[in-house]
C-alpha cells in the first residue's frame, strides 16, 4: 500500500510540474507578483495599465464576457469614470422599443465587456478558422497561469532555433507547448502609451496585462485572503481561551 501511495504522489507531482511548465520546452520563468503570498494584493496602477492594453490591443480579437464595466471599480475607477468608459461602446438593447424594433444604445456599467465579434462563427472567420479564447478566466484555465501567459507574451522569437521550421502564418514561441502557434506577437516595445511614466516595454506590457487578467480570473482574491487571516486570528484567540479554561478546570481538580 505504501508503494502504491508513493507511486501516486510521484505521478501527481510530475503532472503538476508538467502543467506548471506549460508542457514541453523550458520552464516558465517566475515573475515577482504583488498578489503572491498570503498577504499579496493586486496592484491597481498595474491593473489600470493592463486594462488599457486589453482595450487597445487584446480586445480586437478576444472577448471578456464574464467581466462587467461596473467591475472596474476594483481597479480604482470611480462611478463617473466607469460610466464614461462604458458609454464609449454601443450595445443592442435586450428588449425592443415601443415599436417592437431592437435598437442600439450606449453601454451602461451593468453591461458586460463588449465582444469584438457578433458570434463565434464571425470570430472564426476573421481569425483563419480559429476561435480566439475568451480571456475572462484565462489565467485560471491552466496551472501557473500568470507566469505562463507572461512567458507566452514575451516568448516569441524572430527566427526558430537551428533545425526548426515554421509554416507560413505561424510563429515560434519558446514557452508555447509545441512552440508553433498562429497568433502573431501581440505586443512590442512602444506600442501602448503610458501617461504615468511607466516604461513602455514588452516586459512591462506583459506584466501589466497579466496583472489585469489575473484579477479578472480571481476578483475576490483579496477578500478571501483577508477573511482567511481573520479566521486564523480568531481560531488562535479561541484556542488560547480554551487552553486557559482547561488549565483553570484542571487546577481546581488538582
Task: Report residues per predicted region.
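Membrane-proximal low-complexity regions enriched in glycine and acidic/polar residues
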Residues: 92-180
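Boundary at the C-terminal end of the N-terminal hydrophobic targeting segment
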Residues: 17-22
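Electrostatic cytochrome c docking/interface patches
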Residues: 27-52, 63-82, 197, 217-224
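The canonical Cys-X-X-Cys-His
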Residues: 54-65, 209
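Bacterial N-terminal signal peptides
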Residues: 7-16
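Juxtamembrane interface at the cytosolic side of transmembrane helices
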Residues: 224-227, 233-254
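Positively charged n-region of N-terminal signal peptides that target proteins for export
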Residues: 1-4
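Extended, hydrophilic extramembrane loops/domains of integral membrane proteins
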Residues: 176-177, 181-218
Amino acid at each position: 500500500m505504501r508503494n502504491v501511495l508513493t507511486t501516486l504522489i510521484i505521478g501527481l507531482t510530475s503532472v503538476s510540474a508538467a502543467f506548471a511548465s506549460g508542457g514541453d520546452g523550458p520552464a516558465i520563468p517566475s515573475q515577482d507578483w504583488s498578489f503572491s503570498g498570503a498577504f499579496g494584493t493586486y496592484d491597481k496602477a498595474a491593473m489600470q495599465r493592463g486594462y488599457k492594453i486589453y482595450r487597445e490591443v487584446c480586445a480586437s480579437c478576444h472577448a471578456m464576457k464574464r467581466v462587467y464595466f461596473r467591475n472596474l471599480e476594483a481597479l480604482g475607477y470611480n462611478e463617473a469614470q466607469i460610466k464614461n468608459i462604458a458609454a464609449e461602446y454601443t450595445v443592442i438593447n435586450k428588449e425592443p422599443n415601443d415599436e417592437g424594433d431592437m435598437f442600439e444604445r450606449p453601454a451602461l456599467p451593468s453591461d458586460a465587456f463588449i465582444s469584438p465579434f457578433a458570434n463565434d462563427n464571425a470570430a472564426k472567420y476573421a481569425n483563419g478558422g480559429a476561435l480566439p479564447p475568451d480571456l475572462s478566466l484565462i489565467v485560471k484555465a491552466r496551472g501557473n497561469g500568470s507566469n505562463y501567459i507572461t512567458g507566452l507574451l514575451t516568448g516569441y522569437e524572430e527566427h526558430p532555433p537551428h533545425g526548426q521550421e515554421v509554416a507560413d502564418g505561424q510563429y515560434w514561441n519558446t514557452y508555447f507547448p509545441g512552440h508553433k502557434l498562429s497568433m502573431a506577437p501581440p505586443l512590442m516595445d512602444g506600442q501602448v502609451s503610458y501617461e504615468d511614466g511607466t516604461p513602455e516595454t514588452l516586459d512591462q506590457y506583459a506584466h501589466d496585462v497579466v496583472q489585469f487578467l489575473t484579477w479578472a480570473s480571481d476578483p475576490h482574491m483579496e477578500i478571501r485572503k483577508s477573511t482567511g487571516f481573520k479566521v486564523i486570528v480568531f481560531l488562535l484567540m479561541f484556542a488560547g481561551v480554551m487552553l486557559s479554561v482547561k488549565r483553570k478546570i484542571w487546577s481546581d481538580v488538582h
